[in-house]
Amino acid sequence: MNRFVMLTMSLIPLYGCSHHAPMATVDYVDVDRFMGDWYVIANIPTFLEEDAHNAVESYSKNTDGSIATTFTFLDGSFDGERKEYNPRGYIKDTESNALWGMQFIWPIKADYRIVYLDADYTKTIIGREARDYVWIMARTPVLSQEEYEELVQFVGSIGYDISKMNRVPHSWPDQPIGNKDEKEMS
């Protein structure tokens, strides 16, 4: 038993190690411009969002500097139950504002990295150092196929297995939808 405990204890420092190169973030995020609604276009989903439709992540600044986050989606179909989660974001790197901790349950803050952000703040990619989950998001629920493919290729270039990507279905009454009911990467 003592050998087992010693072996286990000796492996603890390796727990956080990854076989990937460190994941770079964007150089700088203007937090005020980043706030607002982001449609989740595609992802490698967590178990909570595996069959999400009309997924939207919304951010707003709290007076204490944290980020109030509202993640909503319809579960299973466009007629599915509306789900809502409210994690709190914490900016961990105030020089770039691109490295956050996202807290769903106290005291755990999940890794949240803004790894891509276009100049006009209309498209972003959120990644994690472990490369287990990723989110492609945009200010509109529709991207052209060319834009979508470019973003998916970027996800692949930073070490993700893009065969695990899901395209999130969107159907909004006032928007022409180009990716409705598409679950595969295309």
Feature map (PLM): residue ranges:
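Sec-dependent signal peptide recognition
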Residues: 2-8
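A beta-rich soluble binding module of mature secreted/lumenal proteins
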Residues: 17-186
